[in-house]
């Protein structure tokens, strides 16, 4: 793996203060509410001039991290105040994440690179694990292992210091990753609709054909016993670790489901789709909440770790932060 020296690339970008730009989109009332769920808009702002591909709450729930199509990662307060930007990655940036120990930020590049940053915005190092675009990068629960996946079909596992542990080659573009909450497995999904469960040593433990076409994201349930996938066929699917389908959620008749997330307390799940709508579902498939949000694609969702807030993003660069109660 090519690792670039830190001293050649270190620069500080944080402690930037900017006026909040409020998006001029009015949030309508939910058209379905069978559960008593309440989403009250806390903050709405413009996070980018282009599509925001992913948003994540920090592990402590105090910050938001966005990855945008222009190759810029941005750290925000929950109130929409920009703390700083991570620039220089070749666009588009498909994902950016914070390590569970809240010490490191990781961003992905279209040129096969990932960059590791500290919270002061200083670039610690740049690594090139792939020769094609890096679609996702994720930390293990103890923050010591990094996993990447790429357009080259490879999922790579290596130490925080850059030493490769394993490389798993599969057909099709590897699209998104999830780490088991106890670190037991890595889930890797692809444009071909396959879901692979890989152990930390790189052995494929199970391959699941989802029938969803390109899979946009994958998540483990909070207890680690189930998996959730979202696809371009308009569905989200719930699986057990044996690869058995528990339920299919037919979210939209046309268009993509771009994000499907477990509620942190495990009672239900949420989807965001091309029709600009947030939906909550019981695990048995009952639609319990539906909120039309915007006349644009919703690209990503993220629950705060305590489940009290939900963040959403759009293809127009908008960010919403809701307070959630039920």
Curated annotation (Swiss-Prot):
CDD domains (UniProt xref): WD40
Protein's name in the database: WD repeat-containing protein slr1409
Tree of life domain: Bacteria
Coiled-coil parts of chain: none
Entries under PANTHER family matching the protein: TRANSCRIPTION INITIATION FACTOR TFIID (PTHR19879), TRANSCRIPTION INITIATION FACTOR TFIID SUBUNIT 5 (PTHR19879:SF9)
InterPro entries registered for this protein in UniProt: Apc4-like_WD40_dom, WD40/YVTN_repeat-like_dom_sf, WD40_repeat_CS, WD40_repeat_dom_sf, WD40_rpt
Alphabetical UniProt keywords: Repeat, WD repeat
Record's GO cellular component terms: outer membrane-bounded periplasmic space
Residue windows of the WD repeats: 47-77, 88-118, 129-159, 169-199, 210-240, 252-282
């Amino acid at each position: 793996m090519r690792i670039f020296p830190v001293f050649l690339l270190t620069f500080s970008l944080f402690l930037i203060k900017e006026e909040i730009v409020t998006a001029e989109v009015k949030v309508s009332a939910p058209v379905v509410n069978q559960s008593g769920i309440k989403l009250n808009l806390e903050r709405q702002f413009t996070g980018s001039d282009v599509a925001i591909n992913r948003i994540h709450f920090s592990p402590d729930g105090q910050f938001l991290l966005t990855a945008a199509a222009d190759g810029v990662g941005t750290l925000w307060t929950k109130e929409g105040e920009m703390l700083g930007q991570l620039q220089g990655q070749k666009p588009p940036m498909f994902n950016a994440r914070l390590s569970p120990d809240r010490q490191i930020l990781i961003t992905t590049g279209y040129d096969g690179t990932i960059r590791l940053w500290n919270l002061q915005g200083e670039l610690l190092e740049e690594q090139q694990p792939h020769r094609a675009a890096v679609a996702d990068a994720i930390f293990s629960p103890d923050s010591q292992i990094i996993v990447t996946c790429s357009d080259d079909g490879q999922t790579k596992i290596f130490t925080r210091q850059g030493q490769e542990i394993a490389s798993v080659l599969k057909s099709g573009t590897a699209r998104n990753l999830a780490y088991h909450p106890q670190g037991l497995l890595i889930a890797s999904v692809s444009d071909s609709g396959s879901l692979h469960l890989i152990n930390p040593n790189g052995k494929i433990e199970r391959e699941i054909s989802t029938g969803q076409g390109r899979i946009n994201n994958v998540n483990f349930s909070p207890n680690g016993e189930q998996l959730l996938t979202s696809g371009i066929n308009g569905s989200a699917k719930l699986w057990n670790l044996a690869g058995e389908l528990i339920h299919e959620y037919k979210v939209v008749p046309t268009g993509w489901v771009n994000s499907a997330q477990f509620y942190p307390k495990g009672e239900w799940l949420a989807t965001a789709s091309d029709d600009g709508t947030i939906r909550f579902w019981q695990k048995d498939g009952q639609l319990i909440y539906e909120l039309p949000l915007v006349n644009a694609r919703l690209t990503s969702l993220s629950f705060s770790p305590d489940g009290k807030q939900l963040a959403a993003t759009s293809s127009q660069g908008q960010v919403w932060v809701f307070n959630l109660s039920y």
